Amino acid sequence: DYRTIPGFYFFAASYHSESRAKLFAEQIYDLMRSHGGGNMRLAVDRLSFIATDALREKRLELVDGEAVSEHARAVKSEEELELMRASMAVCEAGCKSMEEALEPGITENALWAKLHETNIRMGGEWIETRLLSSGPRTNPWFRECSMREIERGDLVSFDTDLIGPYGYCSDMSRSWLCGERPSDEQRRLYAAAYEQIETNIAALKPGLTFRDVSERCWKIPDEFLSNRYSVLIHGVGLADEYPSIKHWVDFEKKGYDGEVVPGMTLCVESFIGSEGGREGVKLEEQVIITETGVERMSTYPYQIDWL
């Protein structure tokens, strides 16, 4: 059954949007009546309110399709995991290209472009964010890359958020130094971020609840608490996905429970920066939950000699 849906978004329909949305709703109603077995309940994940109103006028019962989709996507098949590994290989090749290009005078944008170039050249698709910053722009986190020239002695922190080959997301973070020897303060920040990552990966086990995991995770020192990353751990697949596991200090107000199960692909997050401090360290590792524990998907080297 092949049908052409009338375009009801404003660019295509202008002031005919409502009438064309009604034509769309008529088609959906006909499909439901013909193939729904008497069930007029329809899961919808994304739809304009004009089209939503038109469907409800046809007496369709709309339910949240995003919840259905997110839960279905949470556990990956072996075929999906192979595609995600292929995406990660491209992502890490891009990281290598960035690290090789890192030198004083290169702009944040020019360095970030190395990741884009590698991704496109190797069959990837796009990158969701522009999260690379240097020196004083690394703290607090979430500044987009800019035309700032990176200086000798700067920390450079980034988060890939890369949609690689086959449409799968590779989401890992590293922090590097533009120069030869990190300062004692840079080493201290890095050591704390690394400890958080390793402790929290070790806390992940199949069968634990999200609450269990949050409680077992590394307790952030007060110095770094106000600038903490927004989540401890989140799902990843075609994008950042369910679940979102909150810090223990945030769990009661912002968290929700669920279960860690084999086949989930998760990202373990860390940002360490003092309030008012000059720099911050961003690390993130992408992992698979297995029957017995955790397998790392991201393998790009850490600065172990800083620890």
Task: Please report, for each region that a protein language model flagged, where it lies by residue.
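Active-site neighborhoods and metal-handling regions in enzymes and metal-associated proteins
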Residues: D1-L307
